[in-house]
A protein has these predicted regions:
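Solvent-exposed alpha-helix faces
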Residues: 16, 51-55, 107, 114, ...
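A hydrophobic membrane-anchoring alpha-helix module
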Residues: 144-161
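Hydrophobic alpha-helical core bundles mediating ligand binding, dimerization, or RNAP-core interactions
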Residues: 11, 15-22, 57, 61, ...
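Short, positively charged, low-complexity/disordered linker segments
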Residues: 96-121
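Alpha-helical scaffold segments that form or flank carboxylate-/histidine-based iron centers
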Residues: 1-14, 30-53, 85-101, 126-146
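Short, helix-capping/interhelical loops that line the mouth of catalytic, cofactor-
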Residues: 1-9, 55-102, 159-170
């Protein structure tokens, strides 16, 4: 069994959950004109972030694997401009494109994670906020936990839209 098989399964289950929500996402209103800095994300913004964060965290894992001395600096904060601007840009993409990116990035992440051995999973990085973490911890927290949290966020956003639709007269 691959070292990160349980985490990979969590990623696949989360993807399947996101796919089951696709019809509701397609029927949801487009992202508002204002950028999502002072409000909750709508469905398409959440998907845009998931699409952005998968390759980001894979890149950070690769940075740690390639680093000559441990712990290798890695990570970012939620207010980093590149993160925010990517979500701002991609939140208006058509839903089929958001899902195509999800499939592409998630499969790439899964393939790479299944290649890692115990020694690689034990490599350490150092995050400014979280401190030292192994690659296994990064995969667990920054990929698996993270995508599961956003699945819940997406489902809640869609439930909110459905509740608003039901409460409208007519």
């Amino acid at each position: 069994m691959a070292t990160l098989y349980p985490e990979v399964e969590r990623l696949r289950v989360a993807r399947d959950r996101l796919v089951r929500l696709r019809t509701k996402v397609e029927m949801s209103p487009p992202a508002p004109d204002d950028v999502p800095r002072s409000r909750e994300w709508v469905a398409r913004e959440t998907l845009a972030h998931i699409d952005e964060m998968l390759p980001y965290w894979l890149g950070e894992i690769e940075r740690i694997l390639a680093g000559p001395v441990e712990p290798v600096p890695f990570g970012r904060i939620s207010s980093e401009p590149i993160r925010l601007l990517t979500v701002d840009r991609d939140r208006t993409l058509p839903v089929p494109e958001l899902y195509a990116r999800l499939d592409f990035h998630l499969e790439r992440v899964v393939r790479r994670l299944l290649e890692l051995d115990d020694r690689q999973c034990a490599r350490r990085g150092s995050d400014k906020k979280r401190g030292d973490m192994t690659i296994k911890q990064i995969v667990d927290e920054m990929l698996a936990d993270h995508i599961e949290d956003h699945c819940n966020q997406l489902a809640a956003a869609l439930e909110k839209v459905a509740a608003l639709e039901k409460s409208r007269p007519g």
